[in-house]
Amino acid sequence: VGSELSCDEAYRGHLIENELASCTRRADVYERIRNCRIMVGTVAAISGKPELFRLKHFDVAIVDEATQILEPQLLGILCAGDRNAIDKFILIGDHKQLPAVVLQKAEQSAIYDETLLAIGLTNLKDSLFERLYRNCPAVHRSHDMLCRQGRMHPKVALFANRAFYGGHLIPVGLSHQTESSEHISRLAFYPSQPEKAGGSAKINYSEARIVAGLAAQIYESHRTDFDDSRTLGVITPYRSQIALIKKEIEALGIPALNRILVDTVERFQGSERDVIIYSCCINSYYQLKFVSNLTEENGVLIDRKLNVALTRARKQMFVTGVPKYLKSNPLYESLLNLIETQG
């Protein structure tokens, strides 16, 4: 369910409009939809097709990335209350990674209505997933965590696992997770120089050059199987730094590298690459506050942006930044210390 503009060409033939194009009678349309056991689409796309609920009953709805979806966005699906409603919802998400983007300040989206507060709805910026998760202890509902991860090599996952997940993450044991690390650096830090006073705080030429140099080395080591959509990605917090990194990479004269994704951590959530380079682009102490997204659980401080950035890589994770600024933050200091001893 969706638009051809946002659907990969390989799957456009399965879009509901294309599947129903050959139907000449309403009965044919009904039969085709009734016989379709699985429908896939974004929350917006499914909500925009209310006629589906008049034609078909759904036993289960699985909502992926549920922590990035606000409650009102789910209402159209949750409130289908007739006989053709959805029997059961499964919300899958990670509240320790980035939430939905809300432009309002927390004070503006805060809830003061006693009825809503009684059901745990304290702020409109929170997802239904978070509210239900927070309410579990109060209403004595059981909850658990999916611990097996098939993305990261254990050494790549080491910091995030210890700092944010209490050491509970267990590798599935896929081939890339069991590869030897004897001749490969899984986690490495490359110190950069801060920009001079008076310059833009949102660019760092030293880091851009480091990123380009690493990209060239990675391309050379993967020349025979380099895939711009799979092998390498670069994360950095500012658009200005993205443009600078792209310029430095373009100067290398390697066409394949010009097609790699260089973007913010928000745009990378849900994506993965074999190798990720993270350009922190912190040129002053105060910037650390703006590039973090902090939350706390059971007394443990969690930086959701840092967590996302460090969990995008399958095989290797490289970080570059100014050590003296990064070490002023306890989480970044712990990361650098771990890389120094384990990386």
Where are the regions that the model predicts?
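Conserved helicase NTPase catalytic core signature
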Residues: 1-59, 73
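Conserved helicase motor core of SF1/SF2 NTP-dependent helicases
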Residues: 30, 44-46, 51-343
